Amino acid sequence: MSGDNVRKMVTCTKTSGEFEKGYPDTIIIHYTAGPYQSSLNTLVNPKVKASAHVLIDRDGSITQLVPFNEIAWHAGESSYGGRSGYNKYSIGIEIVNSGPLTKSGNVYRSWFGAAYNPSDVVEAIHRNQSTAKYWHVYTAEQIETVRQLCLELMEAYPNIKQILGHEEVAPTRKTDPGPAFPLDTLREQLLGSDRKSDGAAQLPETGRVAAKTLNIRNSPESDGQLVAQPLPKGTMVSIVSEQNGWYKVRTTVEGWVFGKYLDIN
């Protein structure tokens, strides 16, 4: 890979050789659960049985570790869609992000002790969980780099038809990339969506709940039936469609919310 977003190439020997013919056909998105340098050290450490194809820093820059035509060790024990062992099917993208955070006074802390301000945090419900937690936000630069990289990979490897989270191929043990990453929106953009045609007005991609709580309903009207518990303030949602000031959104559930109470990204 080449271009302005590539910081450097780092040699990583932790591969299982080249993909078989017809693969890769999947991209898997991860968070590092740690800062850039320690994550890079882990990924290249020969004593650690983990690697990835690329590592994306907070500024959107890319470090490539494993060639895209070779199998990296990022998915681990994994299964999805009737297949298991996703390393042999997929390209692994690691994004520098601390994952779940714990509130401590006026700041939020990662498992390794880093402190974050409220502006770096979103409260949201994970797709595999039922209660809201605090999560480290991704930067706009990271999200755009991931989008552009996925486009390039899909062009280079036309068999790629899936973009998955680690949380989807290993739901009982992994939570990355988590609800702070707009995974569903990315899939809609790159793999086809139910949005309007190109000639229609551009919908915003994501939003955050601005009210203390926000009802999510089965129809775009104030007397629509509630489909889940109200979304707490800060919840990030993927926007699917719009109708008369209401947005159809997706988190762990799908439903309609009144657009007035969303901060649009």
Feature names for model-found ranges:
Residues 195-215, 228-232, 241-243, 263-265:
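SH3-family beta-barrel domains
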